[in-house]
Amino acid sequence: MSQGSQHFCGNRTDWPAPILPITDMDKSLEPEWLVKQCTNLRTDWLVLDGYQFDQAYRQSLHSNKFKFAVFDDMNNSGALFADMVINGAQNAGLNGYQLTAPKALLAIGRDYQVLRQEFLQLTNLKWSERNNLTIMFGASDPTKLTLLTLQSLHNVNASMPITIITGAAYEGLHELTDLIKNCNLHITHHHDCQDMASVLVNTKLAISAAGGSQFELLACATPSILVVVADNQKNASQDAASQGWCQLVYSDDLSADELVMQCLSLWQQPELLHSMHKKALQLPVVDGALNIVKLMSENITASNNL
């Protein structure tokens, strides 16, 4: 992985694997380097996850020396050249992967949602012990929704305990710290949080970017307002909203003040929040990573028996 990714993963207390660093090189040379590493290490599967990897990059990774899997959200970036496509959204079957990866194994749907182990070992989901409003807008929050939402909560003198979570790539720490110091709200701030599950199981309502964190919120049965900030978040988030445990809004359609008004309205309806919590509890928490590995292993075994 790149130097930036190494820094992020190296700070994780739950990172289990050795890291193979990619030295500084032209991006066009990366696929050849990766293929060489996989061949030398006798790798069974190479898994690619990232929006920056285009069709040409993926094509260069396709090899008869190892299998190639890609994580995907929308199937909107051309041919995938993959032996396996992974998409944990329940409605991923509508994406038309038969056109862009006609020979690929499809690890798609809720059975393949990937969660860290902390979300598979939850012990306390008691509703009566939840008190906090949690605000989290992903690893970097490029549109500064954390600041805008917190400022709006300050303007209306919100009274509930508030937890702010910022990701490792968040660049507004100085400004956020100043705002927290200068407002009179009851705020706890976690930066690069290492134990998200313990925070979310104590959350009564979350305002969250509608990315992969929605699967973590669901696992913790946390009622949520999911804010769509990117097109690739729409499909999975619409499916989540249909399940009844969250509400869905689009960042382009409302201001931070309007978002906070919706939040306060929901907060003042404890029976509705409890109902959303119970609907989340009815949905199974699946070890999607284990199911993916099983599918990969079965495929390798079948290939070796040919």
Predicted stretch roles:
Residues 285-306:
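C-terminal alpha-helical cap of glycosyltransferases
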Residues 197, 214-220, 238:
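Short alpha-helical segment that forms part of, or immediately flanks, the ligand-binding pocket
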Residues 128-202:
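Donor-nucleotide binding loops and adjacent catalytic segments primarily
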Residues 201-212:
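Acidic donor-binding loop of glycosyltransferase active sites
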Residues 79-143, 173-174:
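A nucleotide-sugar donor-handling region in carbohydrate enzymes
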Residues 265, 272-286:
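A short, well-ordered alpha-helix in the C-terminal region of glycosyltransferases
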Residues 1, 5-100:
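Active-site and donor-binding regions of nucleotide-sugar-utilizing enzymes
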